[in-house]
Swiss-Prot record:
Oligomer status and interactors: Part of the 50S ribosomal subunit. Forms a cluster with proteins L14 and L19.
Function description: One of the primary rRNA binding proteins, it binds directly near the 3'-end of the 23S rRNA, where it nucleates assembly of the 50S subunit.
Entries under InterPro entries matching the protein: Ribosomal_uL3, Ribosomal_uL3_bac/org-type, Ribosomal_uL3_CS, Transl_B-barrel_sf
Record GO cellular component, one term: ribonucleoprotein complex
Listed name of the protein: Large ribosomal subunit protein uL3
Gene designation: rplC
Pfam families in the record: Ribosomal_L3 (PF00297)
GO biological process, one term: translation
Modification(s) after translation: Methylated by PrmB.
Disulphides: none
Superkingdom of origin organism: Bacteria
Gene3D superfamilies: Translation factors (2.40.30.10)
UniProt keyword list: Methylation, Ribonucleoprotein, Ribosomal protein, RNA-binding, rRNA-binding
Taxonomy of the source species: Bacteria, Pseudomonadati, Pseudomonadota, Alphaproteobacteria, Rickettsiales
Amino acid sequence: MAKRIGLFLEKVGHTAIFDNEGKRIPVTLLHLRDSFIISTKTKDINGYNAVVLGVESSVNIKKPQLKILEKSNITAKCRIFESRVDNLDGIVKGAKISITHFVENQYIDVTGYSLGKGFAGVMKRHNFKGLKASHGVSIAHRSQGSTGQCQDPGRVYKGKKMAGHLGSSKVTVQNLKVILVDQERSLLVVKGNNIPGAKGSYVFVKDAVKKSVPKNSFPVCTEDLKLDNIV
């Protein structure tokens, strides 16, 4: 099936629910702010097919993004994202996308930026064992040890696991199950607490590439879904 639009949702936080058997299930809440289609990119012009999405935001918007919104006659403050698709059938400029784009019991892939943890040593960053706690080791218990060889090759190989910045990296978690779709609150309830990012951060949610895709089609623009400030 063709690749559908992926959406950018705000991470609200963690909680837990209980199923019919009384089993506790940890979940993560993702909120979809007002999202609509600003424009599209075609393979003939841009080299790939994509949908440019505007997501309502309360933070300050940079001038380049404001210019893009002005060209589309949009007065609302929106953050601009892009989602690649296989084809543009049924994509209409000005269509508002609902949280029902996803369905219950489907599987999704979530991409976000992990929490930054600053400069970390090799034991925390790469799970090194460390040196011995006694028997001659002095003030180097958490050291990484040797980093290379002798005169040949006389250098440290690229990609060597060493101390450095931990976190703040782009992470994708695959095959997360959608427990509930709350259309009234525009919430997506996802099983598990392993979605990357801090509270209030945006994550990219799309259909799981390793699981079956739901049969509902692309969102279709109707009169009641169009925003008033889009021409």
